[in-house]
């Protein structure tokens, strides 16, 4: 579950116990992350992200949660490398997270896993 107000992604096991809490950066005010219930549609170990004003190749550990692949959960090494902390809205709508957490989530989340994004 992604909580937009707390800028955290909480992972639960099948018994609804918290397994991991991950700091994230979701969409900034001008490009907000939508609130919705979905699932993991596609997974890419590395992919290129495209937007109106950007192209970012090699985005690691990407899991798309919208059928059109517009909203994804992924690592943001450029944010880490720039020293910009997670927990602050910074994206164009995706859910960014540190590389180590994105790697873990990618390897522990199969396609079809339900995803909730809430305010």
Describe the residue ranges of each PLM region.
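Active-site donor-binding loop signature of nucleotide-sugar glycosyltransferases
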Residues: 24-26, 42, 75
